[in-house]
Amino acid sequence: MSTDQRKGWAILKTTLIIFWIALIISGCKQGSQPAKPADTLTGGTINISVDESFKPVIDEQIKVFESSFPQAKIIAHYKPEADCLKDIFKDSATRMVIVTRGLSGKEEKFFKDSINFTPRWDELATDAICVIVNSQSKDTIFTLERLQKQLSGSMENGQQIIFDGLSATSTVRFAIDSILKGKRFDTSVVRAVTSSQAVLSYVAANENAIGLVGISWIGNPEDTVQTKMLKKVKMAYVECSHCTDSPYVKPNQLNIMTRRYPLVRGLFYILKENYAGLGSGFLNFLQYERGQLIFRRAYLGPSKMGFAIRNVMINQKLKKE
């Protein structure tokens, strides 16, 4: 081989080595780049867990959101509140939960230590626990003391109180925390069914039953399913300790927003997402005008937008049953 040929082979060999090194470096750089998120503010698919007592209003929110953004798919899993919270802590696929409380300081620290950021959370609307009775019942007025006595078993009148489960649900937790003030209820006077819809059905079929359900299931007079159910059950009046015009009130929108009705609670989101993904897009929808109007139209109290409350004179008296 001549000197020129050897030089040519050396140059070719060097060129090939440089090419392969460049190719390897390029591949390493591409491999080290983070993968692009599979979802955006208005597109993709995410899973959320929702307290079952909020199903009617969240179904409507998702329906309107998805019709506005056809590339977006929100898969909602309705379940007891405790299971929703387990999902946000343990299930990496769950992007958001909608429940009746936010995170405690201890829970925020857990997330900060484990995933290096704290999920966002806040109240979106105010909800109420509605006391319902059979349409034929004459017993439609309740004080908080009476509810406490019946739940604790110290008042025996043959009535059963119907819950959407004996543990893990937000309705049960509310009854223990806000009515019984931390005490446990007497399981001999309460009955557990599988869902809020099952509570309504049971009370509709049993004249001596009292049910506790979220207002989202029964408080919307524009929902034909709910108005049909209101022919079989009715909302009871509950004592208002600071009302001067009426000692007992129903959980209508005004009484929820002004907290004249005593059994009021919040509807909260917890969002475990640290980029501009579909969870953030759905949250933006819920907390701004369109989502807040849907909460209002469902007769809950919107928490993120102020709506005027006007005083009007109406000729309404408490019905004598």
What are the language-model segments listed below?
Residues 1-11:
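N-terminal secretory signal peptides that target proteins for export/translocation
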Residues 24-27:
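C-terminal motif of bacterial Sec signal peptides marking the signal peptidase cleavage site
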Residues 33-151:
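N-terminal segment of the mature folded domain
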Residues 63-68, 148-191:
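Ligand-binding cleft/hinge of the Venus flytrap
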Residues 116-130, 228-268:
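Periplasmic-binding protein-like
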Residues 129-137, 266-275:
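A bilobed periplasmic-binding-protein/Venus flytrap-type ligand-binding module shared by bacterial periplasmic
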Residues 171-240:
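Ligand-binding pocket segment of bilobal, Venus flytrap-like solute-binding proteins
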Residues 268-321:
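Extracellular/periplasmic juxtamembrane helices and adjacent flexible linkers that interface
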